[in-house]
Swiss-Prot record:
Source organism of the structure: Salmonella paratyphi A (strain ATCC 9150 / SARB42)
Main location: membrane
Catalytic activity: D-maltose(out) + ATP + H2O = D-maltose(in) + ADP + phosphate + H(+)
Known function: Part of the ABC transporter complex MalEFGK involved in maltose/maltodextrin import. Responsible for energy coupling to the transport system.
UniProt-annotated location(s): Cell inner membrane
Amino acids binding ATP: G36, P37, S38, G39, C40, G41, K42, S43
Gene: malK
Name of the protein in its database record: Maltose/maltodextrin import ATP-binding protein MalK
Length: 369
């Protein structure tokens, strides 16, 4: 196992900068997830760690060794791609041992490692089969096993579940989490799926347009996003945003006016907040309340009702703000499209963002953070 450090790492192709001044510390044995929208630079960052892309400037360390000029084969990293990339004419055992064979490993060593990894990944009964006889989940386990038998110090996974259906993704997500707990290897995982990020990671790195937007534990990013981008990206359905104006400030409180002229005091850091400033109030769909238990409410017309069985998502058009809000409630809520529906804003669950997108730190203590 090994730690990974990036110091002021930048990647550019000509005038196009795809990774900007990246500074990261990934500790020995950590499971770190790079997450962000398409084109944010997460796969490029992973490929620089693997040695498949050169670093334009900055330094990469694996353990105590600077890796900028070290070829991929000598870095002690193993990589799993979105594509399984299995040889169709080779058996599972032959696919898993292929890299060791090229490296000149002895047959006894290859067999021992393949058998050990096959037991861990529940592939022992499939070692003689060809890839065409395997399910998608089994093929992905073979691809992971091929990397594991090389005993890398750092394990890199680039969107490994993207080709699987929804049920298999859930199953493989659980298996990868168990695998990490069992092996204790340093793992870096790339995904655009924030559910994968939240459920797998010890630490999440949110990337936006080639920069690190925020690094933290999953619940920290969910409850205390550093800016509006992170707030909108982490969580599903995404956070609701309302335009507000600051009407007063106090110690550890800011009062804002909603578009319907109602005012609400928010428990957030008030340092540097100016009366009269235009800001954005954020509230997650699951944190909105029924109107009968809230002091501050918004009323609108139901546009869409999504019944998911275990929960209901209601899209409400609020005339005062000329936009839809999403309200999410556990269990079934029976309401007709076109009906009038009111929702409440709990001050302690609200977020406040400046015009530049940065967050005013919430002061309400959330569990697990």
């Amino acid at each position: 196992m090994a730690s990974v450090q990036l110091r002021n790492v930048t990647k550019a192709w000509g005038d196009v900068v795809v990774s900007k001044d990246i500074n990261l510390d990934i500790h020995d044995g950590e499971f770190v997830v790079f997450v962000g929208p398409s084109g944010c630079g997460k796969s490029t960052l992973l490929r620089m760690i693997a040695g498949l892309e050169t670093i334009t400037s900055g330094d990469l360390f694996i353990g105590e060794t600077r890796m900028n000029d070290i070829p991929p084969v000598e870095r002690g990293v193993g990589m799993v791609f979105q594509s399984y990339a299995l040889y169709p004419h080779l058996s599972v055992a032959e696919n898993m041992s292929f890299g060791l064979k090229l490296a000149g490993a002895k047959k006894e060593v290859m067999n021992q490692r393949v058998n050990q990894v096959a037991e861990v990944l529940q592939l022992a009964h499939l070692l003689e089969r060809k890839p065409k006889a395997l399910s998608g989940g089994q093929r992905q386990r073979v691809a992971i096993g091929r990397t594991l038998v090389a005993e890398p110090r750092v394990f890199l996974l680039d969107e490994p579940l993207s080709n699987l259906d929804a049920a298999l993704r859930v199953q493989m997500r659980i298996e990868i989490s168990r695998l990490h707990k069992r092996l204790g290897r340093t793992m870096i995982y790339v995904t655009h799926d924030q559910v994968e990020a939240m459920t797998l990671a010890d630490k999440i790195v949110v990337l936006d347009a080639g920069r690190v937007a925020q690094v933290g534990k999953p619940l920290e990013l969910y409850h205390y996003p550093a800016d509006r981008f992170v707030a909108g990206f982490i969580g599903s359905p995404k956070m609701n945003f309302l335009p507000v104006k600051v009407t007063a400030t106090a110690i550890e409180q800011v009062q804002v006016e909603l578009p319907n002229r109602q005012q609400i005091w928010l428990p957030v850091e008030s340092r540097g907040v100016q009366v009269g400033a235009n800001m954005s109030l954020g509230i997650r769909p699951e944190h909105l309340l029924p109107s009968d238990i809230a002091d501050v409410t918004l009323e609108g017309e139901v546009q869409v009702v999504e019944q998911l069985g275990h929960e209901t998502q209601i899209h409400i058009q609020i005339p005062a703000i000329r936009q839809n809000l999403v309200y999410r409630q556990n269990d079934v809520v029976l309401v007709e499209e076109g009906a009038t529906f009111a929702i409440g804003l709990p001050p302690e669950r609200c977020h406040l963002f400046r015009e530049d997108g940065s967050a005013c730190r919430r002061l309400h203590q959330e569990p697990g953070v």
